[in-house]
Structures are given as C-alpha cells and as structure tokens.
Amino acid sequence: MIVLLLQQPKRARKIMVATVPLAETRILLENISWQTFKAMLADMGSGRNTRLAYDKGTVEIMTPLMPHESSNRFIEGLIVALCEELGLEVRRSGSLTLTRDDLGKGGEPDSSYYIQNEALVRDKENIDLEKDPPPDLVLEVEYSRPKVDKFKIYTAIAVPEFWRFNGTVLRIYTLSNGEYSEVELSPTFGSVPVREIPRFLQDAKKNGEMATTRAFRGWVKGYI
C-alpha cells in the first residue's frame, strides 16, 4: 500500500499596513535668485497658510495640513500657558517672515515668540531684522523632512532657541558660538522639562485640549 502525504495549503495571512496621515506637503524650487524669492513673498502676500524658506538659491514651499497645524496650535497654547505660569511676558509673532537681505536667507517658522526681548517689540507692527532682534524662540513642526536646512537659516538670523517637533519627539536647540546644540532643558523655561510636551498632545486627543491644558498647568506648577 502506498500512502501519499499531501501538503495542506497554507492559509493566506493578512498583512496589516499602518498608514500615516499626511501632515504637510513640501515643494522644492531650485535656482531661484534672492530677488525672485522676495518677489514671491510680495506676490503671495501675508494672508496664506504656506510657509516659505530660502537658502542658497533653493526655495521650499510647505503647506500644513490638519495634523501639522493642530500640533502647531496646541504647542503654542502650551507655550503661552508656560509663560503665564512662570510670570513671563510673551509676544506671539506666528509665522513671521524672517529675512535678511545682507545674508540672502529667509524662513517662516510655524510659530515664533518674543519672550526675553518682548519689551523691545511690544508695540511694533513690523519687524526689521537689520534693526530689531529676531524672535527668542521659533518652532518648526516637521512630520516630513524639510528640503532646506533650517539650522543654517536660523543660525544666520541668530535665533537663540529653536524647537523641532517631528510628530513624536520635541527637540530643543540653543545657539552658541554660531551653531546649535541640542539641550535637555530650555533656557527660557528653566527647570520645566518641556521635551515632555508631546505626551500632552497625545492626552489632548483623548481628553480634549482644554482639559489637557489644565492638566499641563498643574504639571508645570510641580517644577516651579
């Protein structure tokens, strides 16, 4: 008697693929003169949601989508709450266009803040970086990799503190001797470990922004 051993067909396995929602779009334009970049800024005006950056003939046009802008706005709310709890004045300057004709560099951060130098710009409607100080703090939300080097732009403009949030991790950089170094604590906010801010963004998705902001204020008080 001959016994045939038949191999049973393997069951098809379901493969789950996690899709990451698009948070922003980035367009790169090359071989653009500084004069053309300035003309683009003038033509596009201020009533837009795109953010532009320029370095060495390259223009990046970033358009924020919901995840990007939601993170940006909520972090801004927490920064303002921090200032209030610490007794710091703050002038929110938003996506202020930061350009220096003499340097040929420019950028528009997601958010920017005058804190240490707030009194110097308190009543100003326009900022001229050849006369006025740059923002003390800028925030860039970067779910995708920028196509221009923001370090070079903000180093040239001499922004003292630079925050980068990639959707998961918040990194803090401070300017010293012409270059940025990553630090654990923000010099602006002292002992408050602001690198923990991302967990409050996650909490807000479950508990709501107002409830999370109240919890954040209580958390900050524990470090004052």
Kindly label every feature range from the protein language model.
Residues 2-160, 164-224:
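Gly/Pro/Ser/Thr-rich low-complexity, intrinsically disordered segments predominantly at protein N-termini
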